[in-house]
């Protein structure tokens, strides 16, 4: 049984990460940041802060509602029964993903190669680490426009870890209906085989993925091929790695870092959506609260992320204060946000880059590479991590609104923008106008076009109907070729920057010269912080000449500008008000997780935008969800009947969750009959001795993470503080020591085993060949 451990995890701010790197060159000397649970959750007034995602509660392996995005992408109903169609090779799978993503100047996903990492698959390619590196792929691109349909929203929500040697893809993908990430494994992913898809053992996965979401490391991501030494090792293979470049810049792993950073907040935002609006989660006030949160989120996205939070914004203040009051009742000491950061690890310090195949399996260079598999305790993803931060009531409303804004794709906002603007152009909404005095200068360019510079308004507007603007327009033969408004400040004091002039014209009128402009921000219409569209800008000035405009326009020419705003956003607020008053428990504003497709369907219906085919919520046509095999509650009774000793049964009780699966990673030394298990335990005894002995050392003196790991103990209801002195641990250590003593004739010595190097100790499983 494997889990998807993206081995280079989410970084915090670059400056903080760089400081960590400066203190710990190579990452090898970095100390563990684990802190006791009581310290992590201590809050004000005697209250304990609450985990937004509790690392001790992995949740059920199979989703109780909905399915993963991966299932929706690759389910196949063309056969007699629903199944999966997963393209092979990996480049074909990637091409299928690209079909759902919007083309962009940069690839819509980021990919790195990791030959010597920290995932459970890290030993699978030994000793051919460089020939069979692990691929990590994260989707960070926007969905492709799909007329009449939502399409899948994969950005920050789909991560793949592919290991060619084992034919395994480990998957983390989002479940829209459940509001959580799912952990899956694809087996037999190789030419000629039929891939099988399983949901993974979440308890195993969340031992490292303590945020129940993807991980990535702090900069400088030295396990990836952004590290020049790693890239050089891969290049010596002289093979194609599934179309993935070997030489890459740090922008690629940084893109994965950014994606996992955003993904880490998704479960926390879902918690706020479901519970922050009040204890009566489906009551009328809670529904109205969610309606207001969604309204502000849509306003925020339509306005191009303009900041609308102001002290004099009464609607916002009412919403924020009500939500803060509910927050203080439920989470008086705040919400703890899980830490997805694991330390950077440099696997090739000082290695002479000679291809292992050129020197043989017994050569010191090959042996040195083998030793790079060692993961010190301080760098192990299994180490319990303290919270990344604590969210508190005063910031709750802004956290919820800006978080919800990220649950909508660019295509969703573009579609809504067009629909609202079309309604406004049809005369269905009120308009208001703002004006300003302008100074104009003109200059003829070498290509024959004319540049007209505009400076309108004096200083910053303070209300009323005045606005200010600085920009330029390029004209040819009376038509606007292009232009830009560098700064546009509206009467409410909000300033728009980088506004594009997308069209317009210049003509003579009875009033003089008239310049009419259409404005946009990117592919959407320009909008103010209130969400309303800027329908047009008109500038007029006296022009006594017969020509529309000439290059000798006086330098001090003065004109007058009128900015027209269409009040089209209130239609959205009205639809949300209607939804808030509805009582359907399954609708867009219920206490269920925020479901993008459900919200968009409701908006489209309410605004008369036409039917919308929803993706990734209804799962009735998908193949049955299957969970990968792992021990059940009756296994100990079966083992006792088959002759397992008491101590062997203790091994099963504490270790079977991870080590009795039918997969070799993590080592399944408890898989098989009691006789086979005894042989496995004897083969694994050296490593077991080291791992168990770590519980007797201070945390900063441990060379390896102790086993069972802390989170496994908590799941078993044991105290990490009491476990080191427990008779159960003493019995396990004695059993393993006796195995080693029966081999060597003397008591094992921890220091001697550590001196040999953990990766040179006998492996936990015999060679299957």
Show which residues each predicted segment covers.
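Residue-level detector of short, conserved catalytic/binding motifs and their immediate flanks
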Residues: 167-169, 203-206, 471, 486, ...
């Amino acid at each position: 049984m494997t889990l998807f451990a993206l081995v280079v995890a989410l970084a915090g701010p670059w400056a903080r990460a760089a400081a960590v790197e400066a203190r710990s060159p190579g990452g090898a000397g970095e100390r563990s940041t684990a802190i006791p649970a009581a310290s992590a959750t201590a809050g004000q007034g005697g209250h304990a802060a609450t985990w937004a995602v509790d690392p001790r509660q992995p949740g059920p392996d199979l989703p109780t509602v909905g399915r993963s995005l991966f299932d929706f992408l690759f389910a196949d109903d063309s056969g007699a029964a629903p199944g999966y169609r997963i393209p092979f090779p990996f480049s074909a799978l990637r091409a299928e993903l690209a079909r759902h993503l919007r083309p962009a100047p940069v690839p819509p996903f980021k990919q790195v190669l990791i030959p010597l990492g920290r995932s459970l698959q890290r030993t699978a390619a030994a000793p051919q680490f460089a020939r069979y590196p692990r691929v990590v792929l994260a989707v960070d691109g926007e969905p492709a426009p799909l007329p009449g349909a939502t399409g899948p929203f994969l950005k920050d929500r789909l991560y793949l870890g592919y290991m060619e040697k084992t034919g395994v893809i480990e998957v983390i993908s989002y479940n829209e209906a459940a509001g959580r990430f799912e952990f899956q494994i694809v087996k037999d992913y190789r030419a000629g085989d039929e891939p099988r898809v399983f949901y993974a053992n979440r308890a195993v996965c969340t031992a490292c993925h303590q945020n129940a979401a993807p991980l990535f490391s702090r900069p400088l991501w030295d396990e990836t091929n952004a590290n020049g030494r790693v890239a050089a090792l891969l290049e010596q293979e002289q093979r194609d790695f599934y179309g993935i470049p070997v030489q890459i810049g740090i922008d690629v792993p940084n893109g994965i870092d950014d994606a996992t950073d955003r993904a880490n907040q998704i479960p926390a935002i879902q918690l706020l959506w479901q519970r922050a609006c009040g204890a009566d989660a489906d009551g009328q006030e809670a529904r109205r609260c969610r309606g207001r949160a969604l309204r502000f989120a849509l306003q925020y996205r339509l306005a191009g992320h303009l900041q609308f939070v102001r002290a004099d914004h009464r609607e916002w203040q009412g919403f924020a204060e009500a939500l803060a009051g509910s927050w203080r009742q439920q989470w008086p000491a705040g919400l703890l946000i899980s830490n997805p950061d694991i330390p950077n690890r440099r696997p090739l310090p000082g290695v002479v880059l000679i291809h292992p195949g050129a020197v043989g399996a017994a050569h010191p260079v090959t042996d040195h590479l083998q030793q790079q598999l060692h993961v010190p305790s301080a760098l192990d993803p299994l180490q319990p991590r303290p919270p990344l931060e604590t969210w508190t009531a005063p910031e709750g409303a802004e956290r919820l609104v800006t978080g919800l804004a990220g649950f909508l794709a660019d295509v969703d906002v573009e579609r809504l923008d067009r629909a609202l603007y079309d309604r406004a152009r049809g005369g269905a909404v009120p308009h208001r106008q703002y004006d300003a005095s302008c100074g104009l200068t003109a200059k003829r360019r070498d290509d024959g076009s004319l540049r007209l510079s505009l400076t309108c308004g004096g200083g910053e507007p303070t209300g009323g109907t005045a606005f200010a603007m600085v920009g330029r327009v390029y004209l040819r033969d009376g038509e606007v070729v292009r232009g830009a408004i560098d700064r546009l400040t509206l009467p409410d004091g909000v300033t728009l920057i980088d506004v594009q002039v997308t069209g317009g014209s210049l003509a003579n009128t009875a009033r003089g010269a008239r310049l009419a402009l259409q404005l946009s921000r990117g592919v959407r219409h320009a909008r103010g912080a209130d969400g309303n569209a800027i329908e047009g800008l008109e500038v007029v000035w006296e022009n006594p000449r017969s020509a529309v405009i000439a290059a000798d326009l006086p330098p001090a020419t003065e004109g007058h500008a009128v900015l027209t705003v269409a009040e089209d956003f209130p239609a959205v607020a009205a639809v949300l008000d209607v939804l808030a008053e509805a009582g359907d428990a399954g609708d867009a504003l219920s206490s269920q997780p925020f479901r993008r497709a459900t919200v968009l369907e409701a908006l489209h219906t309410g605004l008369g935008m036409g039917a919308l085919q929803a993706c990734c919520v209804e799962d009735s046509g998908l193949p049955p969800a299957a969970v990968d095999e792992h021990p059940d509650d009756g296994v100990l009774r079966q083992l006792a009947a088959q002759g397992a000793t008491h101590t062997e049964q203790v091994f099963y009780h504490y270790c079977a969750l991870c080590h009795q699966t039918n997969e070799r990673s993590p080592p399944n030394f408890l898989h098989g009959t009691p006789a086979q298990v005894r042989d496995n335990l004897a083969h694994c005894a050296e490593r077991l001795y080291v791992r168990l002995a770590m519980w007797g050392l201070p945390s900063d003196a441990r060379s390896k993470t102790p086993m069972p790991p802390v989170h496994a103990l908590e799941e078993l209801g044991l105290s990490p503080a009491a476990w080191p002195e427990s008779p159960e641990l003493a019995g396990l250590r004695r059993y393993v020591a006796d195995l080693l003593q029966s081999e060597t004739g003397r008591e094992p010595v921890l220091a001697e085993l550590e001196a040999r190097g953990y990766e040179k100790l006998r492996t936990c499983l015999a060679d299957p060949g």
